[in-house]
Design a protein with these regions (language model features):
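Hydrophobic transmembrane alpha-helices and immediately adjacent juxtamembrane helices
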Residues: 1-180
Length: 180
């Protein structure tokens, strides 16, 4: 176990650079850049609130908060696992040239999506304040479930990345599975 921790520590700078690269690549050639991580959840929440609020006749003022919180969590898991699935295969050229622990690629994918997810949580906090749910100390309890979500996403992502190396169709199957 100590050897694995030492290996991880030795490659921490590479992990940091891979996370930075992932964020930059996600928003390159985009006029708004990382602002999309704030705008996209807002626009999706508005559409879903109008559609489902009208469809179900929901008049609860906190309904958009429920929609946004569920959507942000699911979106992070889906994006994190999708990008992890392709991460080892997309970096195969570097893996063949230089020894790097292969788990760094799925981990960096999960981490950069987690950072984007944390930025998106700003929208959730603002919507909570707007709907009258002001931040309290209880909001800090969200840290543990988010850590569990991060670990679960990494676990699923590394399994999918391993399968994705040998079975390229897994990318399409996983996209379908996420829609279920």
């Amino acid at each position: 176990m100590k050897k694995r921790i030492d290996t991880f520590w030795r490659y921490r700078n590479l992990l940091f650079e891979l996370v930075k690269k992932g964020i930059k690549l996600k928003y390159r050639r985009s006029y708004l850049g990382i602002i999309w991580s704030l705008l996209e959840p807002v626009m999706t929440t508005i559409v879903l609130t109008i559609v489902f609020g009208t469809l179900y006749g929901n008049k609860d003022h906190t309904f958009p908060l429920y929609i946004l919180s569920g959507r942000l969590l699911y979106s992070y898991f889906a994006q994190g696992t999708k990008v992890s699935l392709k991460s080892i295969r997309q970096n195969s050229a570097m893996i063949k040239k230089v020894y790097v622990p292969k788990y760094l690629y799925p981990l960096s994918s999960v981490l950069y999506n987690f950072i984007i997810f944390l930025i998106s949580l700003i929208v959730l906090v603002l919507l909570g304040i707007f709907t009258g749910n002001y931040p309290t100390l209880h909001w800090l309890l969200i840290a543990f479930p988010l850590l569990v979500l991060l670990i679960m996403t990494f676990g699923v992502g590394i399994i999918l990345a391993t399968i994705g190396v040998f079975f390229r169709d897994m990318e399409y199957l996983w996209s379908v599975a996420l829609m279920l």
